Amino acid sequence: MVSSSTIKSLIEKKGKDLPESVKQELYEKLIKYNEKYKLTKVEVETIIDEVIKEYEKALIEPGEAVGTVAAQSIGEPSTQMTLNTFHYAGVAEINVTLGLPRIIEIVDARKNPSTPMMTVYLDEEHRYDREKAEEVARRIEGTTLENLARTTTLDLINMEFIVEVDPERLEKSGLTMEKILKKLQSSFKSAEFEADGYTLIVRPKKIEKISDLRRLSEKVKKHRLKGLSGVGKTIIRKEGDEYVIYTEGSNFKQVLKVPGVDPTRTRTNNIHEIAEVLGIEAARNAIIEEIINTMHEQGLEVDIRHIMLVADIMTLDGVVRPIGRHGVVGEKASVLARAAFEITVQHLFEAAERGEVDNLSGVIENVLIGQPVPVGTGMVKLTMKLPLKPQKEKEEV
């Protein structure tokens, strides 16, 4: 049986070119196997050699057209995706865009996803008790007067707006009529509010037209009484032995501050919010995970390295950029590459106006003019040094 120090020195000696993470993982696995099988020095060396061989086989060849391969590898399975799917992992109450529209949404780096949602995990105190989980959900769920109303009526004779509040919904929300009245009075100075049991009467102080009353009634109905802005309803589900909250709508920055929320595991499907709150590395990981989860949802397998390449290109500059004419492609230095993608004539006119020069260093521009592309063997520039002809000795006179 070899010692752990011998294993470490053998890894350092043989695997000089291996990344540190691979070396560390190899060391941990060898220590474990050594304790179990009592390996000899020759066996350890054989395992290390095999790992190095497999690692070298996994490396991409210099000059490989990785962009083209990634585009094909992601694009081909995407054609098998459904065009519209609106369900989410068993949470039937929450609609979430899946399938091809979601992939397009991610690579376009849309500021606001069509169906934003958060998965909120709870801390040790709240995650095992449903009542405590509901307490946290109430803090998060955005509640408006419209959510609590049983009926709403516009009384055009008395110029009043009457709201019948549902007692059950009111109790569930954790609000009271007094709290609602106080909140509305502080927010709307141009109106008077009166509560009679579960009936709320809104009277504008100064009114000239019926349209003014309608406008005020809409504002009062939509006014947020509690919860986070941008968040609609919440759903509590039991996963394993803990309760998890799913939200319709997203406010990632604020939800992390809510007491009872576990900020280390809570996530959103809004990539830009992740970039703003947690930074660009987290946004890169979110892009990878979102694309992979969307693919898996449809039963499709794509090698993660293709998706990692896309995520790397999108987050290269420290901000999340779309792949398209407003992002990665639109910022290419080559005029011909930009023109080949979209709005050809405009790109060519603008380039001519500015007197731009194309150095023909990329793939697209060389394809356009019929030159060998700088990919694979085309990357190599061969030069040849010809032997100089020996000078004839001057003939003696």
From Swiss-Prot:
Its EC number is 2.7.7.6. It catalyses: RNA(n) + a ribonucleoside 5'-triphosphate = RNA(n+1) + diphosphate. GO terms for molecular function: DNA binding; DNA-directed RNA polymerase activity. InterPro entries: DNA-dir_RpoC_beta_prime, RNA_pol_Rpb1_5, RPO1C. Pfam families: RNA_pol_Rpb1_5. Keywords: Cytoplasm, DNA-binding, DNA-directed RNA polymerase, Nucleotidyltransferase, Transcription, Transferase. DNA-dependent RNA polymerase (RNAP) catalyzes the transcription of DNA into RNA using the four ribonucleoside triphosphates as substrates. Forms part of the jaw domain. Part of the RNA polymerase complex. NCBIfam families: RNA_pol_rpoA2. This is DNA-directed RNA polymerase subunit Rpo1C.
